[in-house]
Amino acid sequence: MKYKDLRDFIKILEHRGDLKRIKFPINPDLEITEIADRTIKSGGPALFFENPTGYTIPVLCNLFGTPNRIALGMGKESILSLRDVGKLLAFLREPELPTGVHDFFSKIPHFRHILHMPIKRVSTAPCQENVWCNQDVDITHMPIMRCWPQDVSPVITWGITITRGLKSKRQNLGIYRQQVLSKNKIIMRWLSHRGGALDFQEWHKNTSERRFPITVALGADPATLIGAVVPIPDTLSEYAFSGLLRGCRTEVIKCISCDLDVPANSEIVLEGYLERDETAIEGPFGDHTGYYNTTAKFPVCTITHITQRNNPIYLSTYTGRPPDEPAILGMAMNEMFIPIIQKQFPEITDFYLPPEGCSYRLAIVTIKKQYIGHAKRIIFGIWSFLKQFMYTKFIIVCDDDINARDWNDVVWAITTRMEPDRDTIIVKNTPIDYLDFSSPISGLGSKIGMDATNKWPGETEREWGIPIKMHDTVRHYIDSIWDKLDI
């Protein structure tokens, strides 16, 4: 299903009974977070706050609060169908020419998707129906949420930040937290390996210009929002990938103040720049770990223009102890990772990032084991294959008779198939998320890999145990009479 903009998606959710309009006045300061947190933990609907206290712009929250809503935003009906998106990503990472007639026809769907990749530039757009500039710029008219009691200020959470490297034609889209400093200044909090930060670093090193153009789009269509968080190949534009997801080209319009393109149907757009050496202390804020993060210096963005639709909608979210919206998005990303990983490691049968592991800090992998030491190869392979897993602290590898998504199964494998000294790998002084305060040094820490597979001759000198399993004939017979037993 194609959604031209966020409003199209809202209509579909409302039609399905998956969006709740709240007319009661609710304060963006803490109160929306409490309602959203309770709702997401119960698997509830998207929330449309029509009357945020003190503001005239409504707030949309919990948009992607369930896996099925994420799938719907990608034009799919269930989270399992997101593996098709992963297969497309795997193809785009390493495209292969057809090897014969049958292979040619099997690849036609992939090539057909490519027709939707080029952006479509328009000359007028809803996102520029209203324009404020210079002294008239004031972001405090937006109902920006303060999410947790010790948060230092309101914070923009769902803005798509758009940048371009000095030597790059490709524009980068990313989601970064932005602390509000004043009516026209926000802090751009991005990790050093993320696309926007890399673009800024390249510009900083290779030019003497004072100002780095940057834009934040709020309330884009679902495909563009999801495209900004999916781990696509570095050579592919998020706009191009959004077109693939949507099934039609992404409409963009040139910013008023610079040459960057923004989604034409965004609700609100903040145009501005980063000064070469202007930074500020960011935080603390409650984060996806369930803790307040430490403070650090990040670049300051000066907003020169605000453009917005008539009667705009402010899209927002919060981060906290899982499950939160980023954790649910992580579950969906998990399904897309699987075909990408399997293309590199075909022996992997499942790959699971439990949401309670804060999205990426713990991975459980099941494999068809083929040789001694196989699990250790998989552990090192995952740490090095995709940059998304450079911060994964724990990797547990099990055989394919274990359900990676069932802790009962995984714990049984760990406690019966692992010998701590032989079957663990600890690597020290490796990159770690700087938000991880458990590491002894910010940004540098250790990782552990666990081999919870059955051990083969050469890995153990002992006779290995045989798992207990009932005869299939007995199980099938009992299945056939189970209802009659009325147990």
Curated annotation (Swiss-Prot):
Binds 1 prenylated FMN per subunit. Pathway: Cofactor biosynthesis; ubiquinone biosynthesis. It is a peripheral membrane protein. It comes from the Bacteria. It catalyses: a 4-hydroxy-3-(all-trans-polyprenyl)benzoate + H(+) = a 2-(all-trans-polyprenyl)phenol + CO2. Keywords: Cell membrane, Decarboxylase, Flavoprotein, FMN, Lyase, Manganese, Membrane, Metal-binding, Ubiquinone biosynthesis. Mn(2+) binds at residues 172, 238. It is an enzyme of class 4 (lyase). Belongs to the UbiD family. PANTHER family: 3-OCTAPRENYL-4-HYDROXYBENZOATE CARBOXY-LYASE-RELATED, FERULIC ACID DECARBOXYLASE 1. This is 3-octaprenyl-4-hydroxybenzoate carboxy-lyase.
